[in-house]
Protein backbone atom coordinates (compact mmCIF):
# COMPACT_ATOMS: atom_id res chain seq x y z
CA UNK A 1 0.00 0.00 0.00
CA UNK A 2 1.35 3.40 -1.03
CA UNK A 3 0.06 6.80 0.13
CA UNK A 4 1.16 10.35 -0.62
CA UNK A 5 2.89 11.76 2.44
CA UNK A 6 2.56 15.55 2.66
CA UNK A 7 5.70 15.60 4.82
CA UNK A 8 7.92 14.29 2.01
CA UNK A 9 5.74 15.20 -0.96
CA UNK A 10 6.17 11.64 -2.22
CA UNK A 11 4.07 8.53 -2.63
CA UNK A 12 5.48 6.15 -0.04
CA UNK A 13 5.04 2.55 1.03
CA UNK A 14 2.85 2.53 4.13
CA UNK A 15 4.49 0.66 7.01
CA UNK A 16 2.89 1.14 10.46
CA UNK A 17 5.03 1.49 13.58
CA UNK A 18 3.45 -1.60 15.13
CA UNK A 19 2.86 -4.46 12.66
CA UNK A 20 -0.84 -5.02 12.06
CA UNK A 21 -1.96 -1.91 13.98
CA UNK A 22 -2.61 1.57 12.57
CA UNK A 23 -2.95 4.60 14.84
CA UNK A 24 -4.46 7.62 13.13
CA UNK A 25 -5.69 11.07 14.14
CA UNK A 26 -8.16 13.10 12.06
CA UNK A 27 -8.86 16.74 12.85
CA UNK A 28 -12.56 17.11 13.64
CA UNK A 29 -14.97 20.05 13.53
CA UNK A 30 -15.23 23.20 15.60
CA UNK A 31 -18.79 22.76 16.79
CA UNK A 32 -20.76 25.97 16.38
CA UNK A 33 -23.03 25.20 13.40
CA UNK A 34 -24.28 22.39 11.17
CA UNK A 35 -21.60 20.72 9.07
CA UNK A 36 -21.46 21.42 5.34
CA UNK A 37 -20.22 19.27 2.47
CA UNK A 38 -16.71 20.71 2.85
CA UNK A 39 -16.62 19.60 6.51
CA UNK A 40 -17.97 16.19 5.56
CA UNK A 41 -15.32 15.42 2.95
CA UNK A 42 -12.41 14.67 5.35
CA UNK A 43 -14.71 12.87 7.80
CA UNK A 44 -16.08 10.64 5.04
CA UNK A 45 -12.81 10.13 3.14
CA UNK A 46 -10.80 9.11 6.18
CA UNK A 47 -13.63 6.94 7.53
CA UNK A 48 -13.52 5.03 4.23
CA UNK A 49 -9.72 4.89 4.45
CA UNK A 50 -10.09 3.40 7.93
CA UNK A 51 -12.61 0.86 6.55
CA UNK A 52 -10.15 -0.09 3.83
CA UNK A 53 -7.32 -0.57 6.32
CA UNK A 54 -9.63 -2.89 8.27
CA UNK A 55 -10.55 -4.71 5.04
CA UNK A 56 -6.81 -5.27 4.50
CA UNK A 57 -6.54 -6.84 7.94
CA UNK A 58 -5.24 -3.97 10.08
CA UNK A 59 -6.54 -3.13 13.53
CA UNK A 60 -7.20 0.62 13.39
CA UNK A 61 -7.24 2.97 16.38
CA UNK A 62 -8.77 6.19 15.11
CA UNK A 63 -9.17 9.49 16.96
CA UNK A 64 -11.28 12.41 15.77
CA UNK A 65 -11.55 15.40 18.08
CA UNK A 66 -14.22 18.00 18.74
CA UNK A 67 -13.02 21.56 19.30
CA UNK A 68 -15.60 22.61 21.89
CA UNK A 69 -14.08 25.93 23.00
CA UNK A 70 -13.11 28.57 20.45
CA UNK A 71 -13.76 32.21 19.51
CA UNK A 72 -16.47 31.12 17.04
CA UNK A 73 -18.24 29.07 19.71
CA UNK A 74 -18.04 31.95 22.20
CA UNK A 75 -19.40 34.39 19.59
CA UNK A 76 -22.27 32.02 18.78
CA UNK A 77 -23.08 31.65 22.48
CA UNK A 78 -23.13 35.44 22.94
CA UNK A 79 -25.32 35.82 19.88
CA UNK A 80 -27.84 33.27 21.21
CA UNK A 81 -27.60 34.36 24.85
CA UNK A 82 -26.49 30.94 26.11
CA UNK A 83 -23.24 29.55 27.53
CA UNK A 84 -20.54 28.07 25.30
CA UNK A 85 -21.22 24.52 26.53
CA UNK A 86 -24.82 24.66 25.31
CA UNK A 87 -23.59 25.62 21.84
CA UNK A 88 -20.93 22.88 21.81
CA UNK A 89 -23.23 20.15 23.13
CA UNK A 90 -25.97 21.11 20.68
CA UNK A 91 -23.78 21.01 17.60
CA UNK A 92 -21.93 17.86 18.63
CA UNK A 93 -25.36 16.19 18.78
CA UNK A 94 -26.22 17.68 15.39
CA UNK A 95 -22.88 16.48 14.01
CA UNK A 96 -23.74 12.91 15.01
CA UNK A 97 -27.14 13.19 13.40
CA UNK A 98 -25.57 14.28 10.09
CA UNK A 99 -22.66 11.84 10.31
CA UNK A 100 -25.08 8.96 10.86
CA UNK A 101 -27.27 10.12 7.97
CA UNK A 102 -24.19 10.13 5.72
CA UNK A 103 -23.03 6.72 6.93
CA UNK A 104 -19.86 7.97 8.66
CA UNK A 105 -18.88 5.57 11.42
CA UNK A 106 -17.68 6.88 14.79
CA UNK A 107 -13.95 6.84 15.47
CA UNK A 108 -12.63 4.87 18.44
CA UNK A 109 -12.17 8.10 20.40
CA UNK A 110 -13.86 11.49 20.09
CA UNK A 111 -12.07 13.67 22.67
CA UNK A 112 -13.23 17.18 23.50
CA UNK A 113 -10.77 19.99 24.14
CA UNK A 114 -12.36 20.90 27.47
CA UNK A 115 -11.78 17.37 28.81
CA UNK A 116 -8.02 17.79 28.32
CA UNK A 117 -7.36 21.25 29.79
CA UNK A 118 -5.26 19.87 32.69
CA UNK A 119 -3.14 17.86 30.24
CA UNK A 120 -2.78 20.93 28.00
CA UNK A 121 -1.56 23.06 30.92
CA UNK A 122 0.93 20.35 31.90
CA UNK A 123 2.39 20.15 28.38
CA UNK A 124 2.59 23.94 28.00
CA UNK A 125 4.56 24.01 31.28
CA UNK A 126 7.02 21.49 29.81
CA UNK A 127 7.41 23.56 26.62
CA UNK A 128 8.16 26.65 28.75
CA UNK A 129 10.70 24.67 30.79
CA UNK A 130 12.41 23.45 27.61
CA UNK A 131 12.66 27.02 26.29
CA UNK A 132 10.25 26.55 23.38
CA UNK A 133 7.54 28.79 24.87
CA UNK A 134 7.37 32.07 26.76
CA UNK A 135 4.83 34.06 28.74
CA UNK A 136 3.57 37.56 27.94
CA UNK A 137 0.83 39.71 29.41
CA UNK A 138 -1.62 38.23 26.85
CA UNK A 139 -0.79 34.56 27.32
CA UNK A 140 1.81 31.92 26.49
CA UNK A 141 3.33 31.61 23.01
CA UNK A 142 5.39 29.06 21.11
CA UNK A 143 8.71 30.48 19.91
CA UNK A 144 8.91 29.22 16.31
CA UNK A 145 12.57 30.27 15.90
CA UNK A 146 13.55 27.85 18.67
CA UNK A 147 12.24 24.90 16.64
CA UNK A 148 14.69 24.32 13.79
CA UNK A 149 12.37 22.15 11.68
CA UNK A 150 9.54 24.71 11.63
CA UNK A 151 8.14 24.81 8.08
CA UNK A 152 9.18 21.23 7.26
CA UNK A 153 5.60 20.02 6.71
CA UNK A 154 4.31 23.02 4.74
CA UNK A 155 7.63 23.59 2.90
CA UNK A 156 7.71 27.18 4.14
CA UNK A 157 10.74 29.15 5.35
CA UNK A 158 10.46 31.22 8.53
CA UNK A 159 12.07 34.25 6.87
CA UNK A 160 9.54 34.21 4.01
CA UNK A 161 6.66 33.76 6.43
CA UNK A 162 7.75 36.71 8.56
CA UNK A 163 8.21 38.90 5.48
CA UNK A 164 4.68 38.16 4.29
CA UNK A 165 3.05 37.90 7.70
CA UNK A 166 -0.59 38.92 7.92
CA UNK A 167 -0.89 37.82 11.50
CA UNK A 168 -2.72 39.97 14.02
CA UNK A 169 -0.19 42.37 15.52
CA UNK A 170 0.73 41.65 19.13
CA UNK A 171 3.71 43.67 20.29
CA UNK A 172 4.21 41.36 23.28
CA UNK A 173 5.27 38.50 20.99
CA UNK A 174 8.90 37.96 19.96
CA UNK A 175 7.84 37.21 16.37
CA UNK A 176 4.57 37.67 14.45
CA UNK A 177 4.68 33.91 13.69
CA UNK A 178 4.74 32.87 17.35
CA UNK A 179 1.39 31.26 18.05
CA UNK A 180 -0.78 31.04 21.13
CA UNK A 181 -0.59 28.08 23.49
CA UNK A 182 -2.62 29.71 26.26
CA UNK A 183 -4.89 32.75 25.88
CA UNK A 184 -5.48 34.93 28.93
CA UNK A 185 -9.18 35.28 29.62
CA UNK A 186 -11.15 38.32 28.58
CA UNK A 187 -13.97 39.53 30.84
CA UNK A 188 -17.00 37.25 30.62
CA UNK A 189 -15.24 34.52 28.63
CA UNK A 190 -15.09 30.88 29.79
CA UNK A 191 -11.76 30.19 31.45
CA UNK A 192 -9.68 27.69 33.40
CA UNK A 193 -6.99 28.12 36.03
CA UNK A 194 -3.33 27.88 35.05
CA UNK A 195 0.13 29.00 36.28
CA UNK A 196 -0.22 31.99 33.92
CA UNK A 197 -3.61 33.09 35.19
CA UNK A 198 -7.09 32.20 34.06
CA UNK A 199 -7.52 31.56 30.37
CA UNK A 200 -8.11 28.88 27.76
CA UNK A 201 -6.07 26.75 25.35
CA UNK A 202 -4.96 27.91 21.93
CA UNK A 203 -6.29 26.00 18.92
CA UNK A 204 -3.11 24.16 17.89
CA UNK A 205 -2.07 22.80 21.29
CA UNK A 206 -5.34 20.94 21.83
CA UNK A 207 -4.81 18.54 18.90
CA UNK A 208 -1.19 17.92 19.86
CA UNK A 209 -2.14 17.02 23.41
CA UNK A 210 -5.16 14.85 22.58
CA UNK A 211 -3.28 12.88 19.91
CA UNK A 212 -0.19 12.32 22.07
CA UNK A 213 -2.23 11.38 25.16
CA UNK A 214 -4.40 8.86 23.29
CA UNK A 215 -2.14 7.52 20.51
CA UNK A 216 1.32 8.03 22.00
CA UNK A 217 4.24 10.35 21.27
CA UNK A 218 4.66 8.90 17.76
CA UNK A 219 1.83 7.46 15.67
CA UNK A 220 1.20 6.45 12.08
CA UNK A 221 -1.16 8.86 10.30
CA UNK A 222 -2.32 12.43 10.86
CA UNK A 223 -5.07 13.50 8.47
CA UNK A 224 -7.27 16.47 7.63
CA UNK A 225 -8.11 19.03 4.98
CA UNK A 226 -5.29 20.65 3.01
CA UNK A 227 -6.26 24.03 4.45
CA UNK A 228 -4.93 22.76 7.79
CA UNK A 229 -1.38 22.06 6.55
CA UNK A 230 -0.38 25.58 7.55
CA UNK A 231 -0.56 26.83 10.16
CA UNK A 232 -2.51 24.22 12.15
CA UNK A 233 -0.66 21.01 11.33
CA UNK A 234 2.71 22.73 11.08
CA UNK A 235 2.16 24.10 14.58
CA UNK A 236 0.91 20.78 15.94
CA UNK A 237 4.05 19.09 14.63
CA UNK A 238 6.34 21.78 16.06
CA UNK A 239 4.80 21.55 19.54
CA UNK A 240 4.86 17.76 19.67
CA UNK A 241 8.39 17.31 18.38
CA UNK A 242 9.74 20.12 20.57
CA UNK A 243 8.12 18.37 23.52
CA UNK A 244 9.25 14.79 22.85
CA UNK A 245 12.19 15.02 20.45
CA UNK A 246 10.49 12.26 18.42
CA UNK A 247 8.76 12.15 15.04
CA UNK A 248 5.14 13.16 15.73
CA UNK A 249 3.23 11.54 12.84
CA UNK A 250 5.01 9.42 10.24
CA UNK A 251 2.50 10.01 7.43
CA UNK A 252 0.44 13.13 6.79
CA UNK A 253 -2.62 12.80 4.53
CA UNK A 254 -4.59 15.82 3.30
CA UNK A 255 -7.76 16.00 1.24
CA UNK A 256 -8.45 18.72 -1.31
CA UNK A 257 -10.95 21.50 -0.73
CA UNK A 258 -14.59 21.56 -1.82
CA UNK A 259 -15.43 24.47 -4.12
CA UNK A 260 -18.95 25.88 -4.30
CA UNK A 261 -19.98 28.76 -6.55
CA UNK A 262 -16.33 29.18 -7.56
CA UNK A 263 -14.85 29.51 -4.07
CA UNK A 264 -13.85 27.27 -1.17
CA UNK A 265 -16.91 26.14 0.77
CA UNK A 266 -16.65 27.94 4.11
CA UNK A 267 -18.95 28.92 6.98
CA UNK A 268 -17.07 32.19 7.46
CA UNK A 269 -18.14 33.39 4.00
CA UNK A 270 -21.60 31.83 4.10
CA UNK A 271 -20.68 29.87 0.96
CA UNK A 272 -22.03 26.52 2.12
CA UNK A 273 -24.40 23.64 1.39
CA UNK A 274 -25.20 21.61 4.49
CA UNK A 275 -24.91 17.84 4.68
CA UNK A 276 -28.43 17.73 6.08
CA UNK A 277 -29.88 19.48 3.04
CA UNK A 278 -27.81 17.40 0.61
CA UNK A 279 -28.85 14.07 2.14
CA UNK A 280 -32.47 15.14 2.48
CA UNK A 281 -32.75 16.15 -1.18
CA UNK A 282 -30.49 13.65 -2.90
CA UNK A 283 -29.90 10.74 -0.52
CA UNK A 284 -26.90 9.46 1.36
CA UNK A 285 -25.37 7.37 -1.42
CA UNK A 286 -25.64 10.22 -3.93
CA UNK A 287 -23.44 12.46 -1.77
CA UNK A 288 -21.07 9.62 -0.86
CA UNK A 289 -20.67 8.74 -4.54
CA UNK A 290 -19.99 12.37 -5.42
CA UNK A 291 -17.23 12.68 -2.79
CA UNK A 292 -15.62 9.29 -3.48
CA UNK A 293 -15.66 9.76 -7.26
CA UNK A 294 -12.94 12.41 -6.84
CA UNK A 295 -9.44 11.47 -5.70
CA UNK A 296 -9.15 12.60 -2.10
CA UNK A 297 -6.19 14.90 -2.79
CA UNK A 298 -7.91 16.69 -5.71
CA UNK A 299 -10.17 19.71 -5.31
CA UNK A 300 -13.85 18.90 -5.67
CA UNK A 301 -16.41 21.13 -7.35
CA UNK A 302 -19.86 20.98 -5.79
CA UNK A 303 -23.18 22.01 -7.29
CA UNK A 304 -26.74 20.81 -6.88
CA UNK A 305 -26.84 19.88 -10.57
CA UNK A 306 -23.79 17.62 -10.17
CA UNK A 307 -25.16 16.08 -6.99
CA UNK A 308 -28.44 15.39 -8.76
CA UNK A 309 -26.54 13.55 -11.52
CA UNK A 310 -24.69 11.41 -8.97
CA UNK A 311 -27.95 10.69 -7.17
CA UNK A 312 -29.60 9.52 -10.40
CA UNK A 313 -26.66 7.20 -11.14
CA UNK A 314 -26.94 5.71 -7.66
CA UNK A 315 -30.69 5.17 -8.07
CA UNK A 316 -30.07 3.18 -11.26
CA UNK A 317 -27.76 0.83 -9.35
CA UNK A 318 -30.30 0.50 -6.53
CA UNK A 319 -32.92 -0.45 -9.15
CA UNK A 320 -30.64 -3.18 -10.53
CA UNK A 321 -29.94 -4.48 -7.01
CA UNK A 322 -33.65 -4.36 -6.16
CA UNK A 323 -34.49 -6.29 -9.30
CA UNK A 324 -32.02 -9.01 -8.31
CA UNK A 325 -33.22 -9.14 -4.70
CA UNK A 326 -36.77 -9.84 -5.89
CA UNK A 327 -35.48 -13.09 -7.38
CA UNK A 328 -34.77 -14.34 -3.85
CA UNK A 329 -31.50 -15.93 -4.97
CA UNK A 330 -29.34 -14.51 -2.15
CA UNK A 331 -26.62 -17.09 -1.65
CA UNK A 332 -22.82 -17.12 -1.48
CA UNK A 333 -20.98 -17.38 -4.81
CA UNK A 334 -17.92 -19.49 -5.60
CA UNK A 335 -14.69 -17.55 -5.27
CA UNK A 336 -13.62 -18.19 -8.85
CA UNK A 337 -11.14 -16.46 -11.19
CA UNK A 338 -13.60 -13.64 -12.01
CA UNK A 339 -14.17 -12.98 -8.31
CA UNK A 340 -10.42 -12.87 -7.63
CA UNK A 341 -9.83 -10.58 -10.60
CA UNK A 342 -12.31 -8.01 -9.26
CA UNK A 343 -10.91 -8.20 -5.73
CA UNK A 344 -7.39 -7.70 -7.10
CA UNK A 345 -8.50 -4.67 -9.15
CA UNK A 346 -10.25 -3.19 -6.10
CA UNK A 347 -7.22 -3.67 -3.85
CA UNK A 348 -4.83 -2.44 -6.55
CA UNK A 349 -6.83 0.80 -6.87
CA UNK A 350 -7.04 1.53 -3.15
CA UNK A 351 -3.45 0.46 -2.51
CA UNK A 352 -2.40 3.13 -5.02
CA UNK A 353 -2.76 6.26 -2.88
CA UNK A 354 -6.34 5.39 -1.98
CA UNK A 355 -7.75 5.78 -5.50
CA UNK A 356 -11.47 5.72 -4.71
CA UNK A 357 -12.60 6.90 -8.20
CA UNK A 358 -11.30 3.65 -9.71
CA UNK A 359 -12.71 1.57 -6.84
CA UNK A 360 -16.15 3.20 -7.19
CA UNK A 361 -16.13 2.71 -10.98
CA UNK A 362 -15.76 -1.04 -10.36
CA UNK A 363 -19.08 -1.07 -8.52
CA UNK A 364 -20.84 0.55 -11.47
CA UNK A 365 -19.15 -1.90 -13.85
CA UNK A 366 -20.38 -4.75 -11.67
CA UNK A 367 -23.91 -3.29 -11.69
CA UNK A 368 -23.93 -3.28 -15.51
CA UNK A 369 -22.67 -6.87 -15.50
CA UNK A 370 -25.34 -7.84 -12.99
CA UNK A 371 -28.08 -6.34 -15.17
CA UNK A 372 -26.82 -8.22 -18.23
CA UNK A 373 -26.46 -11.49 -16.30
CA UNK A 374 -30.09 -11.20 -15.19
CA UNK A 375 -31.18 -10.48 -18.77
CA UNK A 376 -29.28 -13.61 -19.87
CA UNK A 377 -30.71 -15.63 -16.94
CA UNK A 378 -27.14 -16.38 -15.82
CA UNK A 379 -27.84 -16.97 -12.14
CA UNK A 380 -24.28 -17.94 -11.18
CA UNK A 381 -22.69 -14.76 -12.56
CA UNK A 382 -25.55 -12.61 -11.28
CA UNK A 383 -25.01 -13.88 -7.73
CA UNK A 384 -21.26 -13.22 -8.00
CA UNK A 385 -21.74 -9.62 -9.19
CA UNK A 386 -24.41 -8.94 -6.57
CA UNK A 387 -22.22 -10.34 -3.80
CA UNK A 388 -19.23 -8.22 -4.83
CA UNK A 389 -21.31 -5.03 -4.80
CA UNK A 390 -23.29 -5.59 -1.63
CA UNK A 391 -21.02 -7.67 0.57
CA UNK A 392 -17.43 -7.22 -0.60
CA UNK A 393 -16.91 -3.67 -1.87
CA UNK A 394 -20.04 -1.87 -0.65
CA UNK A 395 -19.18 -2.11 3.07
CA UNK A 396 -15.69 -0.70 2.39
CA UNK A 397 -16.91 2.31 0.41
CA UNK A 398 -20.16 2.67 2.34
CA UNK A 399 -22.14 2.42 -0.91
CA UNK A 400 -25.06 0.02 -1.52
CA UNK A 401 -24.09 -1.47 1.80
CA UNK A 402 -26.03 -4.33 3.36
CA UNK A 403 -24.81 -3.15 6.76
CA UNK A 404 -26.41 0.26 6.36
CA UNK A 405 -30.10 1.06 6.13
CA UNK A 406 -31.50 2.61 2.98
CA UNK A 407 -32.64 6.22 3.20
CA UNK A 408 -35.88 6.30 5.17
CA UNK A 409 -38.70 8.72 4.62
CA UNK A 410 -39.41 10.50 7.90
CA UNK A 411 -42.88 10.48 9.42
CA UNK A 412 -42.87 14.29 9.23
CA UNK A 413 -42.30 14.16 5.46
CA UNK A 414 -45.17 11.68 5.05
CA UNK A 415 -47.47 13.84 7.17
CA UNK A 416 -46.67 16.94 5.10
CA UNK A 417 -47.41 14.96 1.95
CA UNK A 418 -50.79 13.86 3.34
CA UNK A 419 -51.64 17.46 4.25
CA UNK A 420 -50.74 18.60 0.71
CA UNK A 421 -52.98 15.89 -0.79
CA UNK A 422 -55.81 16.87 1.57
CA UNK A 423 -55.46 20.55 0.61
CA UNK A 424 -55.81 19.62 -3.07
CA UNK A 425 -58.89 17.52 -2.30
CA UNK A 426 -60.50 20.40 -0.38
CA UNK A 427 -59.88 22.82 -3.26
CA UNK A 428 -61.58 20.30 -5.56
CA UNK A 429 -64.48 20.10 -3.04
CA UNK A 430 -63.89 16.39 -2.52
CA UNK A 431 -64.72 16.72 1.14
CA UNK A 432 -65.50 13.04 1.70
CA UNK A 433 -61.84 12.13 1.08
CA UNK A 434 -60.34 15.21 2.76
CA UNK A 435 -62.45 14.62 5.87
CA UNK A 436 -61.47 10.95 5.87
CA UNK A 437 -57.77 11.90 5.95
CA UNK A 438 -58.44 14.36 8.79
CA UNK A 439 -60.43 11.81 10.80
CA UNK A 440 -57.90 8.98 10.33
CA UNK A 441 -55.08 11.28 11.43
CA UNK A 442 -57.08 12.27 14.51
CA UNK A 443 -57.43 8.57 15.40
CA UNK A 444 -53.63 8.27 15.64
CA UNK A 445 -53.28 11.50 17.64
CA UNK A 446 -52.58 14.07 14.92
CA UNK A 447 -54.98 17.03 14.98
CA UNK A 448 -55.31 19.17 11.85
CA UNK A 449 -56.40 22.81 12.02
CA UNK A 450 -57.33 24.69 8.84
CA UNK A 451 -56.27 28.36 8.92
CA UNK A 452 -56.24 31.16 6.30
CA UNK A 453 -52.48 30.65 5.88
CA UNK A 454 -52.71 26.86 5.48
CA UNK A 455 -53.20 23.69 7.48
CA UNK A 456 -51.43 23.38 10.84
CA UNK A 457 -51.09 20.24 12.93
CA UNK A 458 -50.43 19.26 16.51
CA UNK A 459 -49.56 15.87 17.97
CA UNK A 460 -51.46 14.79 21.08
From Swiss-Prot:
Chain ranges for the short sequence motif 'KMSKS' region as given in the UniProt record: 264-268
Any GO BP annotation: cysteinyl-tRNA aminoacylation
SUPFAM superfamilies hit by this protein: Anticodon-binding domain of a subclass of class I aminoacyl-tRNA synthetases (SSF47323), Nucleotidylyl transferase (SSF52374)
Binding-site list for Zn(2+): 27, 207, 232, 236
Main location (coarse class): cytoplasm
Alphabetized InterPro entries for the sequence: Cys-tRNA-ligase (IPR015803), Cys-tRNA-synt_Ia_DALR (IPR015273), Cys-tRNA/MSH_ligase (IPR024909), Rossmann-like_a/b/a_fold (IPR014729), tRNA-synt_1_cat_dom (IPR032678), tRNAsynth_Ia_anticodon-bd (IPR009080)
Classification via Gene3D superfamilies: Cysteine-tRNA ligase, C-terminal anti-codon recognition domain, HUPs
Cofactor detail note: Binds 1 zinc ion per subunit.
SMART domains assigned to the protein according to its UniProt record, in alphabetical order: DALR_2
Residues noted as binding ATP in the record, renumbered to the chain: 267
Catalytic activity entry: tRNA(Cys) + L-cysteine + ATP = L-cysteinyl-tRNA(Cys) + AMP + diphosphate
Motif 'HIGH' region positions after renumbering to this chain: 29-39
Cofactor(s) named in the record: Zn(2+)
Pfam families (UniProt xref): DALR_2, tRNA-synt_1e
Molecular-function GO terms, alphabetical: ATP binding; cysteine-tRNA ligase activity; zinc ion binding
EC class (word): ligase
Cellular compartments annotated: Cytoplasm
Similarity comment: Belongs to the class-I aminoacyl-tRNA synthetase family.
NCBIfam families given in the database record: cysS
Entries under PANTHER family matching the protein: CYSTEINE--TRNA LIGASE, CYTOPLASMIC, CYSTEINYL-TRNA SYNTHETASE
Description of how the protein assembles with itself and partners: Monomer.
Protein name (database record): Cysteine--tRNA ligase
Gene source species: Thermotoga maritima (strain ATCC 43589 / DSM 3109 / JCM 10099 / NBRC 100826 / MSB8)
Gene it is expressed from: cysS
Amino acid sequence: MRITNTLTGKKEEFVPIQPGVVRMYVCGPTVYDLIHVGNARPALVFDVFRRYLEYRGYRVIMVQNFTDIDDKIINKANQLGVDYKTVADTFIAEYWRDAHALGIRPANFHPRTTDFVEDIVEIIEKLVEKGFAYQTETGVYFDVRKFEKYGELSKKKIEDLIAGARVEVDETKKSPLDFSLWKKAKPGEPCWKSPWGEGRPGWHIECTVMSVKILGESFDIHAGGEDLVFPHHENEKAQAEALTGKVFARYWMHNGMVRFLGDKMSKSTGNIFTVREAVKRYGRDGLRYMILSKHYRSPMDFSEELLQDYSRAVKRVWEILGRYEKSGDIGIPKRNAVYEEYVNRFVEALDDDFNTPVAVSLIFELARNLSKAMDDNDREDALLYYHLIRREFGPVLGLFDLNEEKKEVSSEELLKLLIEVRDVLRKEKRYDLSDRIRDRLREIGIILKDTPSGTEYTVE
